[in-house]
């Protein structure tokens, strides 16, 4: 069962856990409008309780950008992943490496989800469907007609870009199917970063390797920090 936290305001960071926004987009994505440094400035200005964020650019892996100077300047973990498009909706892939890039064409908008899951697992990456309650591009939109996909145990249950009803569907279906759940803002503009995030209790996650280990470990929970979230 997925435990979900909701809060009305942003509070100070709990030193006993890491809080990461696992789903963000920068200007590297074709529909992104946010510069990475501006995300950092916004987090600092608004004192958002985030220890870092993951850039999940659409249909690509941004191997060239180096954000270590920004990490040092702002005290944030800034990691890079990908959002790919499959025949069962969009999937986030953490821990992208050369072997995975050789096995899968990230630019393909109809990747077989089984291939994404299998190749990610084989190469040490971690793949999980995002915004599964969304029409057309969400995992659960395909389950009624096509059945349940084997090999999925984790999905994004809180998404900062969701409209009413989508996250509720994600949470309900995840509970029914026994899936673990995480959260991400799906921000494409600076002001939406941190709307949803993921808490990792008693863990220090400072790079992609430790993030992938934590995702496989399963000790995490989603949190909504939308301005209109209830207590």
Each language-model region and where it sits:
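Short, hinge-like loop/turn segments at secondary-structure boundaries
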Residues: 71-73, 95-99, 145-148, 198-202
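A structural micro-motif
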Residues: 18, 51, 76, 125, ...
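A basic- and aromatic-enriched beta-loop-alpha substructure that forms the phosphate/nucleotide-
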Residues: 83-105
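Mid-to-C-terminal alpha-helical segments outside catalytic/metal-binding sites
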Residues: 2, 205-231
């Amino acid at each position: 069962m997925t435990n979900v936290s909701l809060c009305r305001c942003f509070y100070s960071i709990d030193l006993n856990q890491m809080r990461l926004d696992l789903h963000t987009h920068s200007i590297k994505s074709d529909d992104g409008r946010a510069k990475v440094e501006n995300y950092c400035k916004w987090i600092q200005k608004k004192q958002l309780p985030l220890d870092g964020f993951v850039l999940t650019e659409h249909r690509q892996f941004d191997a060239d950008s180096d954000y270590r100077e920004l990490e040092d300047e702002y005290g944030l973990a800034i990691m890079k992943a990908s959002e790919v498009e499959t025949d069962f909706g969009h999937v986030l892939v953490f821990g992208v490496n050369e072997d995975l890039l050789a096995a899968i064409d990230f630019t393909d908008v109809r990747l077989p989800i089984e291939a994404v899951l299998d190749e990610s697992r084989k190469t040490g990456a971690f793949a999980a469907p995002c915004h599964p309650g969304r029409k057309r591009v969400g995992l659960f939109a395909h389950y009624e007609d096509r059945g349940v996909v084997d090999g999925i145990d984790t999905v994004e249950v809180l998404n900062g870009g969701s409209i009413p009803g989508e996250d509720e569907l994600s949470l309900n279906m995840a509970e029914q199917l026994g899936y673990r759940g995480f959260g991400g803002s799906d921000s494409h503009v600076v002001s939406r970063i941190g709307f949803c995030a993921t808490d990792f209790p008693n863990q220090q996650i400072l790079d992609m390797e430790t993030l992938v280990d934590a995702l496989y470990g399963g000790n995490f929970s989603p949190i909504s920090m939308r301005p209109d979230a209830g207590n």
